[in-house]
Regions:
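Bilobed "Venus flytrap"/periplasmic-binding protein-like clamshell domains
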Residues: 25-55, 65, 112-200
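Secretory targeting signatures
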Residues: 1-25
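N-terminal segment of the mature folded domain
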Residues: 76-107, 111-115
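Periplasmic-binding protein-like
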Residues: 29-35, 103-120, 165-187, 221-265, ...
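An extracytoplasmic/periplasmic, membrane-proximal ligand-sensing/linker region
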Residues: 25-32, 36-47, 256-322
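A ligand-binding cleft/hinge motif common to bilobed small-molecule-binding domains
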Residues: 84-97, 154-157, 196-232
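Solvent-exposed loop/turn segments at secondary-structure junctions
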Residues: 35-37, 89-91, 108-109, 124-126, ...
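Hydrophobic residues within well-ordered alpha-helices
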Residues: 75-76, 132, 203-204
C-alpha cells in the first residue's frame, strides 16, 4: 500500500512539470530579449505583449532571455510558451527537443524562406552538381547558410560529396571543400568577394567556376553593378539546395496546450491586418509580416542539408551558448 502511494506521488510530481495549471492556461509567456530602456519606443516588446493580450483575451508576460540557448531552455522547462529563434537555433530546438514551429517572420517579398542555389556562367562546361568536382568555388563566407552550409550539406546528404576528416568536427567541412572542389574562395567580412554579391562577382570575374548563393542572386545583386554581365550570360544549376528559413516562433507542445497554441497563432496573425500591427512588426519584430507555418514545411529541407554537415550540432551548441 505504501509503495503504491509513493508511486502515485512520484507520478503526480512528474506530471506537474508537464501540464499547465488552470492559472497558467490563461497566461501567454513570450521569451524575448529585453533591455531596461528603449530609445525608440516602437522597439519596446511590451507593445507586442499588450497587442497579443488585447487580441487573445489572455494575460501576456515577457520572459526575459539573453540568448537563443536561454530561449530554448525557457521552452524546455515551461517558463515560456513561445520563443523567436533563428534558423540554426530552431533546428537545434526541433532536433534535440522536438519543439514545433508555428509561425515565421516574412521577408520583404512576403515569403518565409529563400532558396539556396548555385550559379555558373552560361558557357560553362558545368552542367550538373556532379560536375563541380575539382572546380573552383565562390562562397559567401565561412559557414554561411546559402553560401556554404546548404550546398555542401545537400551534396553530402545526396552522396555527391564525401566528408573528409572527423565527422564530428566542423573544421572537417573546410577539408571536405578542399578535397572535393578546386580552389575555394571563402572570404571574411570586408573582403572583396564576401557576401552574396561578392560570391557572384567572384564567379563573374573568373576567380571561381561556380558561385553559391540564392535563386534571386542576379536580381538581388547585379542592378547598378558594372562588374555584372547581362542576365543571359548566367545560368543557375539544378537542382536547388533547399529553403533557408526565416526566424520561426517555436513552441514546446509538452508544456503548452493546443488550445493556447491556436490562440497564439490567431492573435499573432492579426498583426498583419489590425491597427498598430504594422508598427509592431517593424519596430519589435523587424519584419513586414508574419505567417503560419509547420515545422516540416519551414525547416525540413534546411534540416536535411545542414544535418549532413560534419560537427554542425556541436558547432551550433557552442555558438548559441555564447
Amino acid at each position: 500500500m505504501l509503495n503504491a502511494l509513493l508511486v502515485t506521488l512520484i507520478l503526480s510530481a512528474s506530471m506537474a512539470g508537464c501540464l499547465e495549471s488552470d492559472e497558467d492556461e490563461k497566461v501567454i509567456r513570450i521569451a524575448f530579449k529585453t533591455q531596461d530602456d528603449y530609445d525608440n519606443p516602437s522597439a519596446n516588446p511590451q507593445t507586442l505583449a499588450d497587442f497579443i493580450a488585447a487580441q487573445s483575451g489572455y494575460a501576456v508576460e515577457l520572459y526575459p532571455i539573453n540568448s537563443n540557448i536561454a530561449a530554448i531552455e525557457a521552452l524546455r522547462f515551461g517558463h515560456a510558451d513561445i520563443a523567436f529563434l533563428d534558423g540554426g537555433a530552431a533546428w537545434i530546438a526541433w532536433q534535440q527537443h522536438d519543439f514545433s514551429a508555428i509561425l515565421a517572420d516574412q521577408k520583404s517579398d512576403g515569403t518565409t524562406s529563400y532558396t539556396a542555389q548555385a550559379w555558373v556562367l552560361a558557357d560553362s562546361d558545368i552542367q550538373s552538381l556532379e560536375d563541380l568536382e575539382g572546380k573552383d568555388s565562390c562562397h559567401t563566407g565561412w559557414l554561411k547558410s546559402a553560401g556554404m552550409l546548404m550546398p555542401m550539406g545537400y551534396m553530402i546528404n545526396n552522396g555527391i560529396v564525401d566528408v573528409s576528416g572527423d565527422a564530428d568536427d566542423i573544421s572537417s567541412l573546410r577539408t571536405t571543400i578542399e578535397e572535393h572542389l578546386g580552389n575555394a574562395s571563402i572570404p571574411e567580412s570586408g573582403d572583396l568577394y564576401y557576401s552574396y554579391s561578392g560570391a557572384f562577382r567572384c564567379m563573374t570575374e573568373g576567380v571561381g567556376d561556380v558561385a553559391f548563393g540564392k535563386t534571386t542572386s542576379y536580381e538581388d545583386h547585379c542592378e547598378g553593378n558594372d562588374w555584372c554581365l547581362e542576365r543571359d550570360q548566367y545560368r543557375p544549376l539544378e537542382p536547388a539546395f533547399g529553403q533557408v528559413p526565416s526566424h520561426p516562433v517555436m513552441v514546446n507542445t509538452e508544456t503548452t496546450s493546443q488550445e493556447k497554441i491556436d490562440v497564439i497563432v490567431e492573435a499573432f496573425l492579426t498583426l498583419n491586418t489590425a491597427e498598430g500591427g504594422a508598427e509592431i512588426l517593424d519596430g519589435v519584430l523587424n519584419t513586414p509580416g508574419i505567417s503560419e507555418v509547420t515545422t516540416e514545411g519551414h525547416l525540413g529541407s534546411y534540416s536535411d542539408a545542414i544535418g549532413a554537415i560534419p560537427g554542425i550540432a556541436a558547432y551550433f551548441d557552442e555558438k548559441y551558448d555564447e
